[in-house]
Amino acid sequence: MSAMTRTNTPAAPARATTIRRFLFRGERPCHRHPVENAGGSAARVRLRVLAAFLPVTAVLYVGAEALDPRGTDQVVISTAVALKLLPIAAAHSSQLYLSGSLSVLALGGLAVSYAAIAALVTGRGWVIATIAALLGGLGAFAGAMLNVLGGVNLAAAASGHMARGAAARFLVTSFGSVPSQVVEYVYFASEYAAPVVMGVALWRSRAVPRWLAVLFTAGLEVAGSMGAIGPKVVLFMLPFAVAMILLAARIWQAARPAPMTSKTPTSAAAAAPDTTTPLLTSPGS
């Protein structure tokens, strides 16, 4: 046999196999697939958009309550109450329109804010957070309908060209209808239940400090129970606004991309000497 002839062909080293996998299969160490990068970027952008709703909702909510004329937050259950509210509404009809519009926008933002806060709870308590988001969204929707009845309809009845008695009967009929009463019950039940349920979810999940969960629950409960007392309502709603801003910052931080590590495990085949490659022998062996 010739000295340059081998009895068998040595197998390719493991290093070459790794290189071929990188070149032909599209694999790269410490690199993510383009589809994964695009999906992660889209999710982060959506989460940050949701986070922006929290401070905007706080501003709208506080502004709506501050602009609400004094004494106009009553539920019209009789003609006497309607006749009492109509002169106040006639004197502040533009203010009522603005306050009612801001209330509808604030309640819509509150529904989105509940969904954004629930996105923070991904581990323990995520079921409770989901229930709280559903309750909050339902209550916000019912509250928007009730604010249209209470604010916008009151301003329309007061500024319209109709007799006081006819306007009072219109308001009593609107508030006394069965759909209006159902919406009212749903709103008041969800308004007080949703913050407590979400606070429990945040407390159990440890996604935020526990004092922030308490601040959110207490602040939103106080904000929802405030009446039309004028601009000083801002002081009572300040804890709610602070909690919403802090939660928005937490959601924004959660949307940051995870850091990538550059460490790649070294394969045992590449680290160990290749035992499958035969040794070259001299002609005399």
Could you describe each region identified by the protein language model?
Residues 12, 17-18:
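N-terminal intrinsically disordered, low-complexity tails
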